[in-house]
Amino acid sequence: MNENIIKLINDICWWIPFRSKRNLLRNQLISTITDNMHVKNREIYQFIKKTIDLTTNCDDLETKKRIFKENICLVEIGIFSYCNRKCWFCPNSVIDRHSDNIQLKEEIFLKILNELKDINYSNGIRLHRYNEPLYDIELLIKRIKQVKEYLPNCKIQINTNGDYLNLEYLIDLKDAGIDSMLINYYYNGSDKNIEFNLPQIKSNMNKLMQKLKLNYHIDNESDNSIIMKSKYYNIDITYSSINMNILGCDRGGVIDVKSKIRTAPCFHPNMQVSIDYDGIYTLCCNIRSDVKEHENYLIGNVENNNIFELFTSDKIIEFRKHLLRGNSKKIGACTYCSM
């Protein structure tokens, strides 16, 4: 143990008049600090090991599966394309997700689930990507049940704007087996000049909670955001409203929001898989396969490739090497990312 730490422990204990008690406290402090140092050393070792795994080329499929399972916390799948809104802070304001509704092929969806089943995946599954999942409730319920069949231990999440949400849908979602739902209240989705008026926003959010017959509490509120929490049987419900003028993200350079050049490292491609409705695996949740400027950030198609191969591909490894560098300016779609 470091001599300075020993000296500090002695300084703490010196005033105890009885040698036996003084030595007892001294030994307890040394033991506690030593144990904590061992824990911290193990954490550092695991972090280094994972970083090496995620930035090193590998040919063995079983090793690729291990790396995936040890790192991925969330798999995000767009089961269809349609969204009923064109919010200014979303790429759907400039990309057409309104004219047609294109479904992810069922065989691709089941292929993803089958591959995840092969490693007993038990972390998060999010069934939406820049679409409104409740627009097609029948398909959503079907996909939830399929996830439950293939991956019974995973946690199923959905994000919704709440426009279609009613008590009947909530009951259907509960019966199907989702674990959590994030409802977003977009107070200025159609007009970015509408100010964040907290009393008015709270009043409007309360109307939906009353409609759903849900009790709730305010988990957090500030000058630019409010988060309500509720529970419906086994569904954890978060209802939030955020001032996107202040807290919004540029979504890979598509949206003009105030943000500084990013120099912090990014870990999203290490922990999350994002798959669009066309089966394209993208670098992160901010990258979309239907944005032309994002073409270089598309990792591959899960229809023709194993998800573990894509997660450990040469292309994504090179992105990780760049994104993991601290105190260095990020480039391209990542330049102004605030997530």
Language model regions located:
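Nucleotide-sugar-dependent
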Residues: 262-264
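Conserved glycine-rich "GG(E/T)P / GGGxP" loop and the immediately following alpha-helix
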Residues: 67-251
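C-terminal accessory region of radical SAM enzymes
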Residues: 206-256, 286-336
